[in-house]
Amino acid sequence: MSEALKGALIIGQSGGPSSVINASAYGCIRTALDAGCITRVYGAYHGIKGVLNDELLCMDEEDRAELDRLPYTPSSALGSCRYKIKDPDEDDTDYKRILEIFKKYDVRYFCYNGGNDSMDTCNKISKYMKKVGYECRVMGIPKTIDNDLFGTDHCPGYASAAKYIATSVMEVSRDAHVYDTGMITIIECMGRHAGWLTAAAALANEEEPCCDFIYLPEVNFDMDKFVADVSQRYEEKKNCIVAVSEGVPYADGSFVSEAKTAATDGFGHAQLGGLAATLANIMKERTGAKVRGIELSLLQRCAAHCASGTDIEEAFMSGKTAVEQMIAGVTDKLVGFECDRTNGYTCKAKLFDLSDVANFEKKFPAEWITPEGNNVTEDFVKYAMPLIQGETKLEKVDGLPRFARLKKVFAK
């Protein structure tokens, strides 16, 4: 084992938030606060931009009771960003600034909690620090409700979003069957290139049929076939519920839901949305049926009230493991998961090279999609069902959630 490196730790959060990203942060922060070799624990305010702007939060000055509420508090408590640092060979301005801040606060440990692009940031910083000879151990902590990080069995945040989607589909199904006239309901889920979230609608079918069709971005979308499938099911049942990913593409690669403004986020990804309403209008015109389009939108990633207990525990484990491994001398890794479902369900942490993870996407397996391309198989249900087990321990005050309230004391 490598000798424990003495110095401060920074943890940052990046990209879209989730219901359990703060559980990962808590695992990191609590473990770091209890480690004798870590002198200070800082939170990067709004991710890597907080480092660049010298805006670091003193986590050791927060009340313990408030920190203890972090695992059950949604969104990114430290603030997030969508800032993509350039390749240092092209422009090393940001890296020089990061090094300057690291030296100022004697930072020897850096954790970055995020998805694909965040792991790229992590990897670039790690390599730059090695290049300039500054000893700093870097670890990626996974976070993405899209569940598309390469290598790991699944990502913290996905299970809670999946649980919310499945629960919502079950509730919408009850509502849709109230009237004798029947209805077509189209539910839009997040997922730009990977269909893991939308597939979660299949979990709603375990007790009784709720979701009739599921359309994923891994399958080219055919509008005529979609209309025919839904129309036929509606004629048969006088009700039809469809789950569709925001990122379903036409055969030419263009998104069905791509915004006309061609707006993009900070990482250059097209901003999608509005697909449910578009498809609802088309179905209404073609069938004359009552049609409703529902966009789950941000609710998928912040519904802490029905978070998965398993997800919370595993998110905490990923943050805790990151610090433990860095103290042991490990660097330039992502803390992922290795799971066994052969006899029940077990999950343990597994380290992956950041270079093998950065900027790669894990697609939904083709073999888990039905031959018709409009649903998923039982293999997916067996994969996902263990992940959504267990309940949150979210504290309630006057019937409403009591989330963590951080003082956010900035380092000077």
Predicted regions and their residues:
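Glycine-rich oxoanion-binding loops at beta->alpha junctions
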Residues: 2, 53-108, 117-118, 156, ...
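N-terminal phosphate-binding or glycine-rich loops at protein starts, especially the Walker A/P-loop
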Residues: 2-55
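Gly-rich Lys/Arg/Thr-decorated short loops/hinges at beta-loop-alpha junctions or inter-strand turns
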Residues: 5-11, 70-84, 143-153, 180-183, ...
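Short, ordered loop/turn segments at secondary-structure junctions
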Residues: 14-16, 44-50, 82-83, 115-116, ...
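Short glycine/serine/threonine-rich phosphate/pyrophosphate-binding segments
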Residues: 18-28, 51-52, 94-96, 116-124, ...
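Accessory alpha-helical/coil subdomains and C-terminal extensions
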Residues: 101, 109-114, 120-135, 139, ...
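C-terminal non-catalytic interaction/assembly regions of soluble proteins
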Residues: 258-412
